[in-house]
């Protein structure tokens, strides 16, 4: 259990990586004077042949890595990695389960933390949180739009994603995921997910995502249709109270 603990993650997906594109991965420590806030590490994937950025990930580790001078850079050197749409302070981090349900969050997932998803210390591995957030989206979408809105020609593409940890799930924990729509306008939708531990009701992780409405045939972003927007607006979270 000596690995650095991840506290916050902010991911941006800048470009689509096509099949057979050569990938080059990089990991750096961030200088304290880099205007990156509390983030102290940066990882990114780029095209190994031309340097085109595919995705980037800012991390805040509770135990910063001891990086050599050659592996420390400023966020200003890769401005595309800086937060863009998810930069405000979100009220969802302070919500208890009952308050979240009152605000319009719905149950989108439940389960048991299994041993095969945990590390040697019995903690749920970081990638598993992302997977469970992804698994909750179809259930949220059914709540928002119904099964009849499933389409082979249109979907969504996540452009930005952030998650904040307040604790850790352990092997044997029972969890509940609550999800909701924060905003819908133009070509974008903004979703939120809350991961609670059953029993004591502790909020373990909150996550938010900005998704772009995406035409799967043209591979381009598209406007949310007026009828769909109307239905989405009627199911939007009430986070003002």
What is each stretch, according to the model?
Residues 1, 85-147:
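Catalytic strand-loop segment that frames the active site of acyl-thioester-processing enzymes
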Residues 1-22, 134-137, 141, 145-149, ...:
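Hydrophobic, proline/glycine-rich low-complexity stretches
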Residues 6, 107-109, 158, 185-187, ...:
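Short loop/turn motifs at secondary-structure junctions and domain boundaries
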Residues 121-123, 179, 219:
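Hydrophobic pocket/interface hotspot
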Residues 13-22, 28-99, 165-171, 181-241:
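HotDog/MaoC-like acyl-thioester-processing domains
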Residues 2-16, 153-170:
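Small beta-barrel nucleic-acid-binding modules, principally OB-folds
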């Amino acid at each position: 259990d000596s690995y650095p603990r991840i506290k916050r993650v902010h991911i941006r997906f800048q470009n689509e990586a096509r099949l057979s594109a050569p990938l080059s991965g990089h990991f750096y420590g961030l200088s304290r004077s880099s205007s990156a806030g509390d983030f102290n590490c940066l990882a990114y994937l780029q095209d190994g042949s031309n340097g085109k950025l595919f995705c980037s990930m800012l991390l805040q580790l509770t135990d910063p890595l001891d990086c050599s001078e050659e592996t420390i850079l400023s966020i200003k050197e890769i401005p595309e990695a800086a937060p863009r749409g998810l930069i405000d302070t979100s009220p969802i981090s302070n919500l208890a389960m009952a308050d979240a349900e009152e605000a319009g969050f719905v149950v989108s997932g439940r389960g048991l933390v299994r041993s095969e998803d945990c590390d040697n210390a019995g903690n749920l591995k970081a990638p598993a949180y992302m997977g469970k957030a992804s698994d909750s989206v179809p259930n949220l979408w059914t709540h928002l739009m119904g099964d009849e809105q499933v389409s082979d020609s249109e979907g969504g593409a996540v452009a930005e994603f952030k998650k904040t940890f307040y604790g850790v799930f352990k092997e044997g924990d029972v969890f509940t995921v609550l999800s909701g729509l924060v905003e819908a306008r133009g070509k974008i939708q903004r979703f939120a997910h809350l991961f609670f531990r059953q029993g004591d009701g502790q909020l373990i992780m909150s996550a938010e995502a900005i998704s772009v409405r995406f035409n799967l045939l043209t591979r381009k972003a598209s406007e949310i249709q007026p009828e769909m927007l109307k239905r989405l607006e009627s199911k939007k979270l009430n986070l003002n109270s």
